[in-house]
Amino acid sequence: MWNPLHETDSTSVAWRRPRWLCAGALVLAAGLFVLGFLFGWFIKSPNEAANISPQHNVKKAFLDELKAENIKTFLYNFTRIPHLAGTEQNFQLAKQIQSQWKEFGLDSVELAHYDVLLSYPNKTRPNYISIIDEDGNEIFNTSLFEPPPPGYENVSDVVPPFSAFSPQGMPEGDLVYVNYARTEDFFKLERDMKINCSGKILIARYGKIFRGNKVKNAQLAGAKGIILYSDPADYFAPGVQSYPDGWNLPGGGVQRGNILNLNGAGDPLTPGYPANEYAYRLQIAEAVGLPRIPVHPIGYSDAQKLLEKMGGSAPPDDSWKGSLHVPYNVGPGFTGNFSTQKVKMHIHSDNKVKRIYNVIGTLRGAVEPDRYVILGGHRDSWVFGGIDPQSGAAVVHEIVRSFGKLKKEGWRPRRTVLFASWDAEEYGLFGSTEWAEENSRILQERGVAYINADSSIEGNYTLRVDCTPLMYSLVYNLTKELQSPDEGFEGKSLFESWNEKSPSPEFSGLPRISKLGSGNDFEVFFQRLGIASGRARYTKDWVTNKFSSYPLYHSVYETYELVEKFYDPTFKYHLAVAQVRGGIVFELANSVVRPFDCRDYAVVLRNYADKLYNISMNHPQEMKAYSVSFDSLFSAVKNFTEIASNFSERVQDLDKNNPILLRIMNDQLMFLERAFIVPLGLPDRAFYRHVIYAPSSHNKYMGESFPGIYDALFDIENKVDPSKAWGEVKRQISIAAFTVQAAAGTLREVA
């Protein structure tokens, strides 16, 4: 549906226009919206108009069947014990989910297993960090485990804090504090402060970027090892008690997590191919993405003991200071009387090939059974997984139950819906990636969309959505139909509360929708296969709350009680997320015409091109000297805009009783995302193949637009060979221009 995101006359708008549309244009757009809506309504065929009410009634029945109390019960059941990937406990949970999905009424529910490389602490030789004196005596050791939360003291098989896939090693040396270990932090240390990190052990605080990027940056700097810790400035919200009296991180709490740099490869031993019984496996020395230096996480109580002795240079500015009572000196090494002391790492973790299990449920479509809409989320957790992932798994469970109830009553979706409970997401998205690799040919031909369902909440302030532009209109229209769960918005729509609390910085009158990055199971579907993807959850107020994510992330304190006592006592936010995720899946599976709007892609493509052009114009002399031009990209985007507009007009006029024409145009919409995929992938990241979107090279969690061009421009003023660097910029512009032109071609009327 035409909405304020679209522009009324794409051919007459200057490419480098101001961000905000003028008031007159908004009035004109609104007028055209009304006229278009009325025109479209009155030209509906009698059959189509007659079908609206039954379809709407089924959707209402589906949404009404979703119950907060059921989600609460499912979450409680899923969080009684740990479900670490590769363990018997997680296998048993897979079988439990399989059995219950069958009871709910799905046509089939199967287990799909793979043998992948996982990582575990050594049970007899624990990992820890020590301070040693000049004779090698240990004078301080970090904690070996987290104090258990109340009520969980007798739970066994709680994995102690560790960095998954850290190599074994016992390096010792001077300590250097590197802030968040971002690229810009190392630029500050090495270029401005002239501090050499080579041969040092680094300590960095969690936050801002993916932990694997921190480790990669440390390796590039020549470090012997890196220690990660959660600073209270990032994981302790002001005015809130630490767990169990509040939702803040205690001093002994530690964030677990993998530290791989896979760039979409999946299992490190079988990159690009499923890790089945007959797969060829690389040797460990050849494995993809494994870190080369020891890594270990600690809590901020232990970090205090290390940082309080730091000598050397003072922090360059206040942005390097956390909230511990330490000076945050950079080092290298300790100060004064402690200068002869060193830091030593003791890392003994083991990498092992272990079997993992996905649960795949199928609800067969009645009209287009060969077109798949997928709802997937992972079930493996570092410990109890109260938020990550079981708040998402509980919602998926309830969505499956609601769909199953409709099926038992004789209803079927138009298209097939697949439900997935992924394994080993925490280790590197292994379950989803291996399954997608095994089924890639089928998915490329039949995949309509993938909706991710990891954690349902990371706060309780407002909705957060990341998705392809094809789904913008779908998400906006759906949220206008749903009731907001937010206090002060009684009787108002979810769209209204979302728009007020998180407005788009680019489009007036619309809520913010973010780009897809990575760090979750949509990666292989979107970045490698080009299947339209999205995700939704409830989040915190990112404007006022500067702490990273939620404080107890990946710690032993991420329990059911954390959610039930502090985040969502009535589970109304979980229910809202279930309605959004389930509603999106319902529309994707049942709309006669795919609910994708290609015009939204046209608008964002132009914005992305403008952004990169503006970045490049920070170097006007080099642009001129090396004959770098964005004209081909702007021309391609302009062409895409015109063709997308024409396509949308044809959709409005489409005879929906003509099955051949309907199939043709639906397939054009389905394959549009695929048209942005290039077979060779991005430079040095072959499994990231989407030309428009990719995870940032400097932070896996964040999405970047036109990533090939962006990476070529990054830090270009410091490249050794400017001619080669600007040549790469030109090459990436040409690839982007070709891809956008080619994608536009797929929307042309079929001869």
From Swiss-Prot:
Subcellular location(s) per record: Cell membrane
Reactions catalysed according to its record: Release of an unsubstituted, C-terminal glutamyl residue, typically from Ac-Asp-Glu or folylpoly-gamma-glutamates
InterPro entries for this protein: PA_dom_sf, PA_domain, Peptidase_M28, Peptidase_M28B, TFR-like_dimer_dom, TFR-like_dimer_dom_sf
Keywords: Calcium, Carboxypeptidase, Cell membrane, Dipeptidase, Glycoprotein, Hydrolase, Membrane, Metal-binding, Metalloprotease, Multifunctional enzyme, Phosphoprotein, Protease, Signal-anchor, Transmembrane, Transmembrane helix, Zinc
PANTHER family: GLUTAMATE CARBOXYPEPTIDASE 2, N-ACETYLATED-ALPHA-LINKED ACIDIC DIPEPTIDASE
Similarity comment text for this entry: Belongs to the peptidase M28 family. M28B subfamily.
The protein's name: Glutamate carboxypeptidase 2
Species this chain originates from: Sus scrofa
